[in-house]
Design a protein with these regions (language model features):
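Short helix-initiation/N-cap motifs at beta->coil->alpha
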Residues: 43-45, 98-105, 227-235
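N-terminal export leaders
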Residues: 6-12
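Extracytoplasmic substrate-binding proteins
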Residues: 126-198, 290, 299-325
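N-terminal signal peptide c-region/cleavage motif recognized by signal peptidases
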Residues: 20-28
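Proline-aspartate-enriched helix->loop->beta-strand connector
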Residues: 113-119, 135, 240, 244-249
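Structured C-terminal subdomain patch of bacterial secreted/periplasmic proteins
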Residues: 252-325
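A short, structured surface patch at a secondary-structure boundary
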Residues: 56, 62-111
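Basic- and aromatic-lined ligand-binding clefts that recognize polyanionic substrates
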Residues: 56-60, 64-68, 166-221, 230
């Protein structure tokens, strides 16, 4: 596929995409003098061949943007999102908004004329459409192999810009911090992780959507894995009280997304308010100040899949375990 296509072909491609018309943009052209060198890299779809040092990169995933930011790589377009503090600079007008984390803005892409598009997670469903517009990488991760997939993503993006040494250094730091947390976690009592969406609560045991707390970071689980409920196990406050966790970890979805009202237009209840009740206070976690409200954006929006998000999340849990001994 051409690394750059004419405005006319871009318009045709975007029109086809917008109306669901199938068909490739065009056949790959032979290499031309002055064409950027290419490299074969790994991504979630397998192997991909892309140009070295792309400059007009559009990123539709916050964990991938985390990698780009950590390695100081060029970004031209981003998804509109609730950014964590360390990524808030991407809300600046110099970065064009190219859609949401789910839906691309094809008119914006036509203006940007990207030479690389990056999708993952929420945006991965648009891979086939976007790949007709520009070379596209899918940097989705599997929670059960999070560090391995994070390593692949860092290696892939670093290799495009000759920053392999920085990528290796970054991942060595991530792996070292994770191992340090696992050593602390081995000495700690089991914990219960829950996701709160307003007043709805679901436990996240090993293998669940956010089970990486146990699967990757080594926190001993209070609940066993339940393969039949990959999105989590529904719970009420009385269920948590009955389990009596020594540690209770909470992810607040609404705090991550900035949601202010529910579907009925009623104000949402912040998790810190929701969990401030006699049932939770009566648990071992409540009595011993071991209710930990995890960084909502780092966990819910980035899934700990970006190296900086992972380092922040590990540091928070380490501090909690050390303080709660």
């Amino acid at each position: 596929m051409k690394l750059m296509i004419s405005r006319r072909r871009m318009a045709l491609a975007l029109t086809a995409a917008a109306w669901g018309i199938s068909g490739a943009v065009g056949a790959a052209a032979p290499a031309q003098p002055g064409q950027p060198a290419q490299i074969s890299v790994q991504h979630a779809k397998g192997q991909a061949t892309v140009a070295l040092k792309p400059q007009r990169v559009v990123v539709y995933d916050l964990a991938a943007l985390d990698v780009m930011h950590a390695l100081q790589l060029p970004v031209a377009g981003v998804a509109k999102a609730e950014y964590p503090d360390y990524l808030k600079s991407y809300a600046d007008a110099k970065y064009q908004v190219a859609g949401s984390l789910f839906i691309p803005d094809y008119e914006a892409l036509s203006r940007i004329r990207p030479d690389l598009i990056v999708v993952a997670g929420r945006s991965a469903a648009k891979y086939d459409v976007l790949a007709k517009i520009a070379p596209t990488l899918d940097l989705s991760v599997d929670g059960k192999n999070l560090l391995g997939d994070m390593q692949r993503n860092v290696d892939t993006l670093a290799s495009l810009y000759g920053k392999q040494a920085q990528g290796r250094q970054l991942m060595a730091k991530v792996r070292g911090e994770v191992e340090g947390l696992k050593a602390l976690a081995a000495q700690a009592e089991p914990g219960l992780l829950v996701l709160a969406v307003n007043t709805s609560i679901s436990a996240q045991p090993p293998g669940a959507r956010f089970g990486l707390l146990h699967d990757v970071l080594g926190i001993k689980p209070l609940l066993a894995a339940d393969a039949s409920k990959p999105r989590g196990v529904p719970m009420k406050m009385e269920d948590i009280a009955r389990l009596d966790p020594a540690w209770l970890y909470v992810i607040d979805r609404n705090a991550a997304t900035g949601t202010q009202t529910d579907k009925q237009g009623q104000p949402v209840i912040a998790s810190k308010q929701l969990f401030d009740n006699a049932q939770i206070q009566g648990t071992r976690a409540g009595r011993n100040a071991r209710v930990v409200f995890l960084d909502p954006k780092g966990w819910y929006l980035l899934g700990s899949a970006g190296p900086t998000a992972m380092l922040h999340n590990v540091a928070q849990i380490k501090a909690a375990l050390q303080a709660g001994k």
